[in-house]
């Protein structure tokens, strides 16, 4: 079992970079501090995202950090983005820095950023399984580098109150290595009824930093599903039809 370091040795203060203060009066209420992992995967839960979020938006939010992979979580039935994602970083320092974005405003939404957690299996170790490409858009092998399983329970203290929307996905590791090792259950973390979350007041919203995302350079997302009604052969005709016309 890996050793952990706590991140309570740092003051998470707001500044113009779009970060929020952890545990402040305008935040998400009191949370028990989690431990930072000392070995991969270094994965953060990012919640309360707009429903039209795509991968490029996540890259822009954490543009100064070393991102390894991004997974936007979708509804299994509708394939719609559920409003949260998992971001794996190359090193623990980037994960630690990402936690300072908790409470930052993106539009009219207050971001939720926390350490993603998995559940240890009964036989020891963190479970994983081998398989083909993820059917939710992760790409690459589904084998876990860090041994996390998407069906494992985890506990980051958030409710699954996200519905609908459209989002993008990441094709895989941006450095041609294994994709994000963390395969978490398609649902945000849950906590007991003592969770003290409230929406910030208008006065608190006015005092919090805002993240500014530039307009997308590509009008149509790269991962948009192709039109099923489009012609398979384009402007060309099947060979049988061409031969028949020549004979006439």
UniProtKB/Swiss-Prot annotation:
Gene Ontology MF, one: translation initiation factor activity
CC annotations in GO: perinuclear region of cytoplasm
GO biological process, one term: developmental growth
Stretch list, region Disordered: 1-41, 122-248
Key words, A-Z: Acetylation, Cytoplasm, Initiation factor, Methylation, Phosphoprotein, Protein biosynthesis, RNA-binding
Localization per record: Cytoplasm, Perinuclear region
Amino acid composition bias (Gly residues), ranges on this chain: 15-29
Residue numbers carrying N-acetylalanine: 2
Matches recorded under Pfam families: RRM_1
Biased composition (Basic and acidic residues): 131-163, 196-207, 237-248
Main location: cytoplasm
Annotated positions of the Omega-N-methylarginine modification: 19, 22, 136, 166, 175
Domain RRM intervals: 42-118
Biased composition (Polar residues): 220-230
Post-translational modification Phosphoserine, affected residues: 13-14, 21, 24, 32, 230
Expressed in which tissues: Expressed at high levels in heart, liver and testis and at lower levels in brain, spleen, lung, skeletal muscle, kidney and embryonic tissues. Both isoforms are expressed at similar levels.
Top-rank lineage group of the source organism: Eukaryota
Chain's role: Stimulates the RNA helicase activity of EIF4A in the translation initiation complex. Binds weakly mRNA.
Full protein name: Eukaryotic translation initiation factor 4H
Native source species: Mus musculus
């Amino acid at each position: 079992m890996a050793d952990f370091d706590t991140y309570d040795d740092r003051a998470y203060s707001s500044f113009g970079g779009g970060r929020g203060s952890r545990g402040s009066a305008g935040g998400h209420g009191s949370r028990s501090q989690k431990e930072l992992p000392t070995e991969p995967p270094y994965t953060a839960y990012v919640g309360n995202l707009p429903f039209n979020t795509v991968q490029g938006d996540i890259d822009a939010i954490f543009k100064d950090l070393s991102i390894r992979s991004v997974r936007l979580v979708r509804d299994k039935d509708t394939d719609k983005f559920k409003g949260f994602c998992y971001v794996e970083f190359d090193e623990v320092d980037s994960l630690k820095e990402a936690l300072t974005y908790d409470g930052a405003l993106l539009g009219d939404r207050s971001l939720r950023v926390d350490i993603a957690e998995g559940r240890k299996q009964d036989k020891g170790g963190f479970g994983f399984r081998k398989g083909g490409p993820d059917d939710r858009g992760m790409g690459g092998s589904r084998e876990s580098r860090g041994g996390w399983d998407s069906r494992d329970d985890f506990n980051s203290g958030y409710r699954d109150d996200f519905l609908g929307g459209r989002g993008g996905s990441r094709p895989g590791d941006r450095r041609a290595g294994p994709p994000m090792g963390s395969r978490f259950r398609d649902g945000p973390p849950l906590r007991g009824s003592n969770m003290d979350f409230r929406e910030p007041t208008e006065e608190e919203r006015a005092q919090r930093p805002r993240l500014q995302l530039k307009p997308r350079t590509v009008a149509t997302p790269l991962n948009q599903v192709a039109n099923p009604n489009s012609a398979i052969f384009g402007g060309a005709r099947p060979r049988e039809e061409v031969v028949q016309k020549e004979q006439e």
